């Protein structure tokens, strides 16, 4: 992938554009927090050719939600589980809505 290809992907929510340091700064948290939520398998950062963690905007949104819960006093493991369940619920609701749209002849 060339530099121009990478630049064109910056609008892609799944493109791992952010280093760990930049991601931590954007979230107002520490690199240790990002490592912890990675160890809890909330997010799995991609790795650069040099082995450094890289994060996407989608992953940063997930991490921000976990940080919000931790800031409210929720243990990190529980916060990660809550975020996973919220994400699963949102996906199930989206699929359900699509199913209802397809099965409703009035739509």
Model-identified regions with their sequence ranges:
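Short coil turns linking two alpha-helices in DNA-binding domains
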Residues: 30-33
